[in-house]
Amino acid sequence: MARRPRNSRAWRFVLSGVRRDQDARSPTLPAEEEAWGYDSDGQHSNSDSDTDLLHLPPSIPSAVPVTGESYCDCDSQNDPYCSSLHTFHQIKSCQCGEEDNYFDWVWDDCSKSTATVLSCDNRKVSFHMEYSCGTAAIRGNRMLTEGQHFWEIKMTSPVYGTDMMVGIGTSDVNLDKYRHTFCSLLGKDAESWGLSYTGLLQHKGDKSNFSSRFGQGSIIGVHLDTWHGVLTFYKNRKCIGVAATQLRNKKLFPMVCSTAAKSSMKVIRSCCCRTSLQYLCCARLRQLLPDSVDSLEVLPLPPGLKQVLGNKLGWVLQMGSNRSNQHKGDTSATTSCGSDSDSSCTPGQDDCQRKRCRRI
């Protein structure tokens, strides 16, 4: 009996399941029913080549979460990845680094993708609660206008997939535009800037190496200096570089996005202050003191003033301090700073600030 020829289209349907983006399910859950005929970015594939289907495309993201990049040494944050469903549910909530009780802004319940859920007084955002079919995003409920703005985002879930990003953008960013496409949303156009968990920085669709990766337990700090129009990123409370300049007079919002199923991020600090003489002095003090010391502890300040500065400008004085250095910093970043402790990363550029202050 003659052998029946293979149906190439049927084989394409079978093998296309391999090409489905790994974001579509949590890395610790059993595989869901596959959607036939779709490639890794959610777009329909018209290729009839059997050879191409036998190999994974190089752009397929890893379903294995990033580990070992946590701010703290909690076991649940740094343990090697285990695909066991039991292990996933046994991960305990880590509270390290969450000292603040007052927040200038939280996530905006009216400016978010449909695949997002808010909790913890709108400070924690969870993406794709059951499964993922694209990219979800959200922005803060306050526009970052005049002054100095600093906030920290903590990765409270496994970090994996096509992309999970932290950044800023204008009100023109369509947060629901890519709800059926897996992509790096922040920085895809000229209206936003985004830092990926892979360490890539993106703006206008152009990506560049910026830092090492970050994962569950990592704390990503963002400083927007509207006085000079400068955007700076921190990882685990150590500077990793200046990401953008010439941002003056732009109406920006804090933003995050994720393609990963059952992923989440939490605002653990959001504060702002005027570009005052007090701020400039604190920024200069941080530059002059070694990174190994806590500025508020070593300076002979009256208790009342120390408390006021701690509440208002603690983020300026404590970046890179001893408390932060007890945790692992970003030592492999390739950024404009040259190193995590580079003084050019300290908030404020004193020479330029001094000149502008004289004009006031």
Curated annotation (Swiss-Prot):
Sequence segments annotated as region (Disordered): 20-55, 323-350
Recorded GO CC terms: Cul5-RING ubiquitin ligase complex; nucleus
GO molecular function: ubiquitin-like ligase-substrate adaptor activity
Keywords recorded for this protein, A-Z: Nucleus, Ubl conjugation pathway
Gene3D superfamilies linked to this entry: 2.60.120.920
Bias kind Low complexity: ranges: 331-346
CDD domains linked: SPRY_SOCS3
Record-level GO BP terms: negative regulation of cGAS/STING signaling pathway; negative regulation of epithelial to mesenchymal transition; proteasome-mediated ubiquitin-dependent protein catabolic process; protein K48-linked ubiquitination
Pfam families on file: SPRY
InterPro entries reported for this sequence: B30.2/SPRY, B30.2/SPRY_sf, ConA-like_dom_sf, FBXO45-Fsn/SPSB_families, SOCS_box, SPRY_dom, SPRY_SPSB3
Protein localization: Nucleus
PROSITE patterns xrefs: B302_SPRY (PS50188), SOCS (PS50225)
Domain B30.2/SPRY: 85-274
Domain SOCS box: 264-315
Main location (coarse class): nucleus
Pathway membership: Protein modification; protein ubiquitination
Oligomer and partners: Substrate-recognition component of the ECS(SPSB3) complex, composed of spsb3, cul5, elob, elob and rnf7/rbx2.
Stated family: Belongs to the SPSB family.
The protein's role, per its UniProt record: Substrate-recognition component of a cullin-5-RING E3 ubiquitin-protein ligase complex (ECS complex, also named CRL5 complex), which mediates the ubiquitination and subsequent proteasomal degradation of target proteins.
Domain notes: The SOCS box domain mediates the interaction with the Elongin BC complex, an adapter module in different E3 ubiquitin ligase complexes.
Name of the protein described by the UniProt record: SPRY domain-containing SOCS box protein 3
Protein's organism: Xenopus tropicalis
Lineage: Eukaryota, Metazoa, Chordata, Craniata, Vertebrata
